[in-house]
């Protein structure tokens, strides 16, 4: 008998839980009265690129919960946007090319009763992706090619880069996500042989532009062999901080997350803009370089804000730490300027976006016309906080070594 009672109780509990899982989780309707409709104002429709905003007058309903807008996109999919009872407008997005669409505005009360719909006609403008696509500028470059585009409305977009494979099918090789107003984006790691490429832009609503098709031949480049680098002694103008190391080779040890005194090259400069020099071990036409600052002080303290790089093939100049800049060749007539993605003040620690950007290394390209050189002088013109010291974590150079 005890066993029978236990089984009965267990069945009751299981049945009870099963029943609870199917119950409505929320407020049951307290009435079935149909709420009143919204009143769309005479100038209540504001059309914009990719959508529209509808402004209306709310009904006098004490239990109004929200207003929903139901509409169909050109691809046939249905969308629904909701605006709270404290708002008198609803914004609709997701349209591609300019179109006429009809929107149903429906009020919903706390009992989930719905009003009769009010139909509103909107005339959307082209999505921003088409203007972005028209602004797209593509040029052959080192190790691939470069993309530039303008996005004045800061639309969240995706730029996809494809290459025609041996089966005559375009396959994706790069995908870039951005909402920045102006973008310069290299595509790297490609062989220096002619190939067919395709580029298109889409938004987060799956609207696509046409595909720009180009045949391009990337310029050859390779990362210079760091094992060949030879450090040049530091100028007597400067001293090494006790918080850093005098071993210049830490700048090409392959570790980009150094913080301690044994991993950071740290110069106290005084009245002069700090610099150091390297013998690359090979004469090379440089294409670009990448710079990493001290990890725990990204975009702060002694992190470089402005950089200039000089080169020479004269060993008497290159090996002399006291040689004047006038004896060297300036390789970047336009100063390399560090850019902080967040745009925040240096007094504010790096955001997640800042950190990820800096951890990947900040990169600059050399002009095409720079001569091939063997010695480099790296000079910091300013820091993010205006200090006269330099902290550097890692540097890497790419280019084309010259045969003797």
Predicted features, each with a name:
Residues 16-19:
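C-terminal motif of bacterial Sec signal peptides marking the signal peptidase cleavage site
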Residues 21-62, 113-155, 210-235, 398-403:
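Pro/Thr/Ser/Gly-rich low-complexity, intrinsically disordered linker/stalk tracts
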Residues 51-53, 58-78, 150-173, 300-305:
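Solvent-exposed loop/turn segments flanking beta-strands in beta-repeat/beta-sandwich domains
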């Amino acid at each position: 008998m005890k066993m029978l009672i236990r089984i009965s109780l267990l069945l009751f509990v299981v049945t009870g839980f099963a029943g609870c899982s199917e119950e409505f989780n929320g407020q049951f309707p307290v009435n079935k009265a149909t709420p009143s409709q919204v009143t769309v104002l005479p100038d209540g429709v504001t059309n914009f690129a990719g959508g529209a905003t509808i402004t209306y007058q709310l009904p006098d309903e004490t239990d109004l919960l929200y207003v929903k807008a139901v509409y169909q996109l050109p691809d046939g999919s249905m969308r629904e946007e909701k605006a709270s009872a404290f708002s008198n407008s609803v914004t609709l997005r997701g349209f591609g090319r300019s179109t006429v669409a009809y929107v149903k505005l429906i009020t919903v009360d706390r009992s989930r009763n719905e009003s009769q719909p009010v139909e509103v006609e909107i005339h959307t403008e082209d999505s921003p992706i088409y203007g972005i696509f028209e602004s797209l500028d593509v040029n052959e470059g080192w190790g691939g090619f470069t993309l530039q585009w303008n996005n004045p409305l800061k639309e969240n977009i995706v730029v996809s880069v494809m290459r025609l494979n041996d089966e005559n099918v375009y396959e994706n090789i790069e995908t870039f996500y951005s909402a920045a107003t102006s973008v310069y984006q290299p595509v790297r790691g490609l062989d220096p042989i002619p190939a067919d490429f395709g580029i298109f832009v889409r938004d987060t609503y799956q609207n696509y532009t046409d595909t720009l098709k180009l045949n391009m031949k990337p310029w050859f480049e390779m990362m210079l062999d760091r094992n060949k680098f030879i450090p040049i002694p530091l100028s007597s103008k400067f001293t090494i901080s006790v918080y850093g190391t005098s071993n210049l080779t830490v700048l090409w040890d392959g570790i980009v997350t150094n913080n301690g005194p044994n991993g950071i090259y740290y110069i106290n400069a005084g009245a002069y803009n700090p610099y150091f020099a390297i013998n690359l071990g090979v004469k090379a036409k440089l294409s670009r370089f990448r710079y990493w600052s001290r990890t725990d002080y990204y975009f702060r303290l002694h992190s470089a804000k402005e950089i200039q790089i000089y080169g020479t093939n004269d060993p008497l100049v290159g090996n002399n730490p006291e040689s004047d800049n006038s004896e060297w060749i300036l390789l970047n007539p336009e100063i390399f300027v560090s850019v902080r993605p967040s745009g925040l003040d240096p007094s504010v620690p790096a955001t997640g976006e800042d950190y990820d950007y800096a951890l990947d290394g900040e990169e600059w390209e050399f002009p095409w016309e720079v001569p091939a050189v063997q010695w480099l002088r790296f000079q910091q013109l300013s820091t993010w906080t205006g200090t006269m010291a330099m902290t550097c974590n890692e540097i890497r150079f790419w280019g084309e070594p010259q045969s003797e």
